[in-house]
């Protein structure tokens, strides 16, 4: 492909309630999506933001990866591969992980991993892992380990077996983790795994409708060594959605209904409620572990920015997303390493697009000081 910068698609706006500056990064009338919120996809210097955009308007259309400056300028296409979406990708999007230094993007197409240069888009083949995947099976989900040596991939057919790829040698092998790799601790060579078989199905609701639910076993979080040994309990099933708290060994996430809180859990202690208030839905943490951003629902109270040391939070901005069942309507906010940029998605225009909110130091300090949106909005 010919890699050249595209014209900016940015639309700048100010949240009318909070005064926070928000930039719509993608505006072309095709679905766009940011990266999952469990791992940074903003370069450590806050220069570039990575996101996906669908190549054309069709149910199984492929997704390409772009980078853009944090101010919405210098839109640049990094990848263009395959003619259809990834069958076992994240809603059709190929799994991708940014390296610790933000210079390399590891992208999984099929069962083959490539390294993509974030500045130029040049691709390098890292490893083809077809020999570890049986017929009808596939690799999905990616977790980058402590010090960036290994990437763990889930086997779609198994809830216990992963593939571990050594980026130094290119050697890939099966490893029994006893669950699905959900994240890698960055303070020690351990992996957070979710044990239990998740089987998605539906159940009736009191109003005669149906809702999606897990018909399998309740998940439990453990940590294991990078070879699957030394299993340690983190916590039972308390989270609706969770991630590691940045580079720490703690886990943060939103409580299961009827809880309206963000939990913090770690090995050797009881989970604690960091804060309570609206129904926190999906939450991502800054790499330094100081900030958490969460969307809300039932009702939508906007994105909430939480200061971890104090547990104080305020409304950052309102996304205007539908927040309905389909994934495109979820804001799924993620936050930069230093907590100064928050990226989210909204289908407010009728087509899902990617946005960034710029968090001012004044706003951060107001949260630390315990300032509320309005006195009457205080949650008890």
Region locations from a protein language model:
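Repeated scaffold domains used in trafficking and secretory/extracellular systems
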Residues: 35-39, 87-97, 134-143, 182-191, ...
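Blade-level signature of beta-propeller repeat domains, shared across WD40, Kelch, NHL, RCC1
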Residues: 328-380
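Blade/loop signatures of beta-propeller domains
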Residues: 1-23
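Blade-loop segments of beta-propeller domains
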Residues: 31-38, 60-106
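Loop/turn-rich, solvent-exposed surfaces of beta-rich toroidal or solenoidal domains
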Residues: 258-262, 272-312
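Asp-box/WD-like beta-propeller blade repeats and closely related beta-sheet repeat scaffolds
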Residues: 80-161, 174-184
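Conserved blade-ending motifs and adjacent loop-strand segments that build the rim/top face
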Residues: 238-239, 275-284, 312-335, 373
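Hydrophobic beta-strand positions that form the internal "hydrophobic ladder"
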Residues: 49, 105, 150-151, 198-199, ...
């Amino acid at each position: 492909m010919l890699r050249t910068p595209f014209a900016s698609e940015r639309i700048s706006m100010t949240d009318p309630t909070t005064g926070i500056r928000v930039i719509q990064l993608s505006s072309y009338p095709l679905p766009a999506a940011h990266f999952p919120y469990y791992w940074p996809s903003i370069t450590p210097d806050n220069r570039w933001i990575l996101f996906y955009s669908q190549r054309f308007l069709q149910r199984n259309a492929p997704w390409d990866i772009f980078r853009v400056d944090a101010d919405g300028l210098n839109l640049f296409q990094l990848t263009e591969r395959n003619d259809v979406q990834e069958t076992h990708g994240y809603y059709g999007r190929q799994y991708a992980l940014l390296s610790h230094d933000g210079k390399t993007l590891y992208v999984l197409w099929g069962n083959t991993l490539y390294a993509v240069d974030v500045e130029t888009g040049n691709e390098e083949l890292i490893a083809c892992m077809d020999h570890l995947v049986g017929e009808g099976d596939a690799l999905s989900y990616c977790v980058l380990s402590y010090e960036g040596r290994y990437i763990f991939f889930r086997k779609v057919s198994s809830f216990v077996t992963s593939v571990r790829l050594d980026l130094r040698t290119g050697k890939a092998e099966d490893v029994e983790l006893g669950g699905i790799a959900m994240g890698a601790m960055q303070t020690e060579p351990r992996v957070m795994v979710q044990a239990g078989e998740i089987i998605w199905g539906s159940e009736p609701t009191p109003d005669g409708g149906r809702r999606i639910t897990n018909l399998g076993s309740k998940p439990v979080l453990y940590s294991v060594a990078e070879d699957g040994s030394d299993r340690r309990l983190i916590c039972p099933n308390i989270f609706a959605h969770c991630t590691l708290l940045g580079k720490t060994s703690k886990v943060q996430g939103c409580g299961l209904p009827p809880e309206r809180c963000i939990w913090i859990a770690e090995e050797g202690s009881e989970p604690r409620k960091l804060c309570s208030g609206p129904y926190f839905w999906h939450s991502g943490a800054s790499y330094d572990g100081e900030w958490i951003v969460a969307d809300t629902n039932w009702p939508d109270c906007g994105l909430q920015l939480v200061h971890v040391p104090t547990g104080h939070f305020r409304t950052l901005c309102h996304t205007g997303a539908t927040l309905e069942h389909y994934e495109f309507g979820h804001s799924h906010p993620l936050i930069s390493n230093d907590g100064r940029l928050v990226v989210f998605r909204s289908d407010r225009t009728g087509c899902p697009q990617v946005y960034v909110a710029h968090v001012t130091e004044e706003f951060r300090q107001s949260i630390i000081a315990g300032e509320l949106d309005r006195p009457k909005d205080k949650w008890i």
